[in-house]
């Protein structure tokens, strides 16, 4: 069976078209159409306040005009370093209306990492949080010569009538101003800045967990295409949906969900701190979302909250999960709370806008699978050695895809672009670096990142497979499998398991738990897969998106 025969189509929901007409134009044009049609409709709920599409139309126009009047031109980069809050939405839409490129910057980066990213993209303007301005940015301001304007926003500076953020002292060669002051003092109509489908709209940096962070250039056409695929897949009832997600907008998954809500006129609930479980539970209760999105680790945090488990989930249609593997037993536990068939695992990456696969919205969902390739997406699994030869369906290899959602390339990284985007068989293919397989029904299973695969005596150990086994043990709350150099065998690695104990076993002695886990591994795992080293930690480090940070674990090993 060939991948070109698209064996996954037989598993599509009824009514989902395998191909689709891809929209043209720009994302800004799409936003404006929706905002003008429904100005009084709620666009976003945030900390008890509501921003309408009309508010967003006006404020984004003022923001865009302000960018133009301080000298920014089409193709210049505006960087946003905020948690999920209304100002982020204003900056997204306003940046695109000005013809500029938006780039997200994680608030969790160190000053040196911030400086690298701002310089790498030659950012002309930065929108940052008041708490971050003094703690981080002011320390590196002098090392970013391209940056001319810094706009400072605050948590309580809401759409209208919130607490004002005082102006900060100017920095050498830079203008520093409160975000809302900047917005309010400019006219609501920007100058025309027409963008084409092939122009870059988002410059989103990869998390840097596998090396130096790189900026993925995503075009208006990429984002509109992926939105169309997502909407075709989900069959959203636009007037009847409310979206709530803990994915931060500085991450492509969060930016995509937020932008999709704007593009389809769907209200969204903004979560500034996804680790504040009590706040998420309160918003779930009060806003009644139909769609919830989170990474697995945050769903696990919610499952540990008694108030979450008592919520009425009858109005929730889907709980989407992505960005990391979700242990099968935990998926079933979540569905025992939110309802059977509501868990929707997806897979993608920053470089693909981000979605590549998803489990059917209404049809059969397979636990442990990231679902089926989306409409208008070519998909293959190829050999790990050279990335050229298709492996048979059912065998493991590198996942590659081609489609309108695939990025233009990496910003100023031609060699890395050539390595990731390879032209063959009449298409440009994104080589994802993920290892996986496809079953006979077309469902995809991501086994591991190629860089997370551990080699033991010539055998491949897939970390997600081993971690999934350990999640069945009651003492394991969170775990991560990594490979360490083997000084006795340079061609082999030593398997190490880092464990954050579950709440029920937190007080148990490490030695007793380790002995129990070793016995468990002997029963459940082949000897070469079983960890040789166990480490117990109070908290496993997470990335800014909530994924286990294996780079940090390897760095301290």
Give the predicted meaning of each segment.
Residues 109, 116, 126-131, 403, ...:
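AMP-binding/adenylate-forming catalytic core of the ANL superfamily
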Residues 82-83, 100-118, 130-137, 266-286, ...:
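ATP-dependent adenylate-forming carboxylate-activation enzymes
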Residues 224-242, 250-290, 305:
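Conserved AMP-binding/adenylation subdomain of ANL enzymes
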